[in-house]
Structure formats: structure tokens, C-alpha cells
From Swiss-Prot:
Biased composition range(s): Basic residues: 1-10
Pfam families per record: PUF_NOP9
Signal peptide per UniProt: none
Entry protein name: Nucleolar protein 9
Organism: Coccidioides posadasii (strain C735)
Family: Belongs to the NOP9 family.
Location of the region described as Disordered in the Swiss-Prot/TrEMBL record: 1-54, 187-207, 684-722
Localization per record: Nucleus, Nucleolus
Gene name per UniProt: NOP9
PANTHER family: NUCLEOLAR PROTEIN 9
Species classification: Eukaryota, Fungi, Dikarya, Ascomycota, Pezizomycotina
Amino acid sequence: MPRERQKRGRRAEAKKDKDSQKRKRGHEATEAEITKRQKIQGDESSEVPVPHDSVFGHGDDYIPLEEEAAPVDDTPFYGLLDSDEQEYFSRANQTLELNQFENDEDRQLFIDSVLQEAGGKELKIACSQSCSRLMEKLISMSSASQLKQLFGKFSGHFLHLVQHRFASHCCERLFLRAAPIVTYESKPRTKKGDDAEENQDGGESASSLPMADLVLNAISELEGNWGYLLTESFASHTIRVLLLILAGKSLDNSSNIAVVASRKKENFDAFKTDPQSSSGKRSVPPVFQDALEKMINGLVAGLDTTYLRALATHPVGSPVLQVLLAVELTHLGKDRAKDPNSVLRRLIPDDSLENTESATFINGLFYDPVGSRLLETLFQHVPGKFFKMIYKSIVRERIGSLSRNEIASYVAVRVLERLSKEDLQATMDTILREVPSMVERSRLNVIKALIERGAVRGANLTPLANTLKSAYGEEAVSRLKKILKLDEASEPSKEDPTKSATNLPSQQLHGSLLAQAMLRVPGPLAEMIRSSFLEATVPFLLDIAKSPTGSRVLQESLIFSKATGQFRRQIIPKFSGHLCELALNTSGSHVVDILWQATSDLLFLKQRLADELVANEKALRDSFLGRAVWRNWSMDLYKRKRGEWISRAKGLDLNASTADSSNNEQVTKPKSKLDLARERFAAQVEEKARKPESENPKGKEEIKAGKKRKPAALSAKSLLSA
């Protein structure tokens, strides 16, 4: 192999040494220059640490072990489940999911055995991707003593668990289940044996403390870290839950669920076995009030107005800020809104909004997808005086343009809910000019809110009805098609068919909600929908009945208490001959069910429809939906006991709850006014009969006039014996 040509001799070696000395001097100069730059002026002793890569004391080939100090992750590792444990807990999860237990006692025994097997492994299960859902189910179905034991297992680890991807859901569920138990324990006890029963199952350390203390101990573990947890993707959900629990808010309210729920697809409340419900406002111990104020102050401590306003549009921090604002304005009193350290005053510190930064901040939230939700919460709970200031300064002149926007329209709805009758009527006149544009864009939520609030406030809705009629057209059937968006289902948009198909379900839903709101208000708005139904052809009516959104409108129009008898007599015969077809359809079966109620005073129509169901009995019994319709119409009773079915069809009450012919059913006719008068008279006679004869000398005559009594037979027997 050929070698590289190298110069030999003393001259070549001298040149090589000279070049190496030059390189060494260059490196030393560079090192000295870097060291000088890193010294702090005015203090020669204080130096900034020199990076490893700029120090050559160990030679050019030196590579340090830790060139860059990585952030230290202090999250503890609780271990992993082995394969046998994972298989066991996966089977337990499937068993609870199927819920095929014979009774509640068997299910509780199974839960106890699973919890016993999970002893000492609770933290592993909570942090496991495959088994954390089992822990959520176990928490939902555990008793109070078992929940206290779980609090004991989680104690000392809440700060790390609430930040874990899977364990955070278990913490949420644990706090949600603890809320009704706190309410139950805060009530005065009447039985001394209640505590003894709870302490039987759990150990002394688990059940000795009340649930309120366990919740407060968990909150104390999170103190000092609120600023970081506020924007942590998993811990923020737990913070919202804790705020609602401390405030005693309803945990089943839809508005609260929207800002709390981590997963919409699962409903673990279905597994609850305790009798205490979390619905409605809950009573909480007084110590929760102090803990709530301390938690709110800790969450916003050190946060200035600029940071809070930036948090308003933060995807994770904004929902926490919404709960903070709602709890502060509703639970801590109206005086809290005047406190300069409150969340409201730190967001909007100005008393006047004209040409201020607060006005700019509010204007920017109207069109932000995240910030608009905070603005909804603000308008919903802010005191009346503060609301009027914002409305007059910012909203009143822009209500029309806000109603047109897809995002700002939801804020406009919250504004309409707070307006008085006079302000609502003036606002309606402004919005009416934008109705054609809103109808064209299918932005109907503001129109629906106008109808609902106008009915509540007693406003004149005739101008709105005329505007809607001109916007949708004068032809009745075409108008209904445009409202329900049924004609666009088969004709996608030529410009962007993908976008049209994506937005169509949402547009159909909003159109259905608008039509239902119009039917609930008697007058020209309801007549617009009813006249369209009467002029519609039978095939079009069947299409509406089979539509998931259109069938809701049809059901609303057939409700007995709202629909007139003339309308029901005209539209119900159109369904004759198509009842079996509707009964076998998912949406149409609900229309058939509502026909039973709609024909309460139209017995001849109800019998005609029942005969049609009998003629299609086999097809109905072979279908799940058909069997439900058959049961709701009491068709077994119709075939075997026609008289009792007629009594039920007329709206008469039956003692039996089902229409099974094997049960002995008794028909109780509604009492007429004459029967009620007779009962009152008989009650008066009995009262007078109980009084002494000295007080009521005419009692005997009134008793004889009222009704015959058994003592008369006894007096006859005494006469015979005499």
C-alpha cells in the first residue's frame, strides 16, 4: 500500500514545532479573552461559571460527562404491574364494564375483593395506562370508608398524581366522590350507629378523620405550586374540581361539567352506588369558605393584570380563570367585585371603560375562541351595575355585528339574558336589520335567544316573526325546508362540498332548535311552523319524522298541552298507513310514541292507529324499536282487554304500572266535581258526628240526612232485646 510522502530532516521538524507553538498561543489568547468577557464589571471576585466546552485544561480531546445540565425530574416512579396483575385487573375492568351481576350485593362483594387485591398497588394502578380506568370505576363504586382508605394511600403524593396523565383522572374522580360525602357528614347525625358502620369496614387511620379534613389535607399538599399548576395540562382539571367542591357548587350542572370534564365519552357517574347526589347546591362546612378564599388568593398571588389578561386566552389557563371568576362573583358575595385585589378588578381595574386598556381587552375577547368563553362567564355572573357599564360602553352599539359573528354571537346571547324588557325591545330592533344575513349564514342562536327572552320578558315578537317570514320566504313548505336544512342534505355545495357536508349537521341542529323555540311561543311564530306542517306532503312529513333533528320539531308540534285540537286532527291522519315504517325507524319511533299523547282526546284516531299496529304485530315484535312502541302503546292490553285499554287511552289512571294481561289491573276513573262535592259533604258530616251531642244537638238529623251509619243497626238490635 503506498505511503504518504513526508518531509524528513531537522528543517521539517523545526517548522512543525513552530506551527504547534502558534496554535497554542492562539488558543491561550482566546481562552483569556473569553474569561475576561465573563467577569462582571465592578466585582472582580464574582465570575460567571465558564462552560466546559470553553475550558481546555484537560486537553483538546477531553469530553465532560455532563456537558449540559438537564432539568431534574423529581416525579417519583411508583413501579409497574407485572403481567399477572395486569391480566387480573384487566379482567376486573371488563367485568365491571359488562355489569352482569345478579344484584347489588354481588357487585359490592366483587368490588371489595378487587380493592383487597389492589391493596398496596393503588399508586401503580392509578399511573397505569391500561388499569387507571379500573381505579376510576372502583372509586365511583366505593363506600365512604373505602374512599377514605384511598385518600390515605394517595396522601403525600397528590402533587405528583395531579400532574400525571392517567392518575390525574383518578384524583378528579376521588374529589368528585368525596363532595357528597362531605355534605352528608356536615349534617347533624341522628343515629350514633352510622359512624360505627363506617369504621367497621375501614381501619382506624382511614375512617377516623372526616372527609372534609381529608380533602383539605390534599389541598394543603398543592399549596405553593398554584402558579405552575394553573397552566398544567392535567392538573388544571383537578384545580377546577376543587374550586367547585369548596364553593358547594352543583357538580351535575351542564355549565360546570363543560369546564370540568376531562373526557366526554365516558360517564362514570353511571356506576355510582351511594344515595347521596351531587346535584343542586351542596352544603359545605364553614372551614371550606376559608380554604376557598385561601386557594383563590394563592392562585392569583404574584400575577399582575398583564399576566391575568394573557391567561384569559390561554387554552389551559382560561377554563381555570372562568371557574375562579364564577366562584368569586357568586359565592364570595357582591362586595368581592369592589375589592381591588379580586380577580374581576385585576382583569378590569377601570371604573370607566371609555378609551381605556380594559375596553381594548374586552373588545379583543369577543372574537377569540378561548377568550369569548371567559366573557360569557363575565356577563353571566357580573353584578348588575358593572354589567350595565359594559353594556352601555361597548356592547349596545355593536350588538348587531356581534350577532353575525360565529364566535361573538354566543357572548351576545349571554348579554340578551341580562337585559330588561325595554333594553331587549331596543336591542331587537337593532338585530332585526341583521336577521337576513344571519339566516343566510345559519347563525341562528341569537334569534333563538331573542324568541326565548322575548317570551320571558313579554316583548312584542310580531316584528321578528315578519322578518323571519321574509327571510325564509312566504311559501310554507319551502320555508320549513330552509329552516331544517333538509333540502341541502342531498344537494351539497358546488363550491366546497367537503365543507358543506361538515357544517350541515351543525346547521340542521341550530335550525331544529330555532323551530322548537318558535313552537313554544304562542302566536305568529308558532303558526309559521304549524302551517308548514299542514301544507307539507306525506312523503315530506315522513322524511322529517325520520330525520334526527326534524323529528324533534315534529314531536314539539304534537305535544298535547301546546298543540291545538284542530291542528292535531288535521295532521295525525297523515301518518295513517305509515305507522309501522316509522315505528321501525330510530327517530320515527319517537314520533309514534308522541302520537299516543297527542290523541288523548281523539279516541277514534287512536283506535285507528292501534289497529294498524296490530296488523303489523310480527314486524314490530321482531324489532327492538318496534317492541318499545308496542309496549308504550299498551297493545297487549288492546288485544285482550279492550275496555281497560280504552280507559287508559282516554287518560284514565291505572293502578298497574304495566300492560301485562297477567296482572290484575284496576281502572280508577277520575273524580268528577259532583264526586268531590259529595266527599267534602261526607267529611263535614263525620267531623260533626265526632263532636258531643251537647255541642251539636242537630248531629243526628244531619247524619241521617248525610248517609246511613252502622250504629243504626246496633240500636235496632237493642230494641229487639228490650
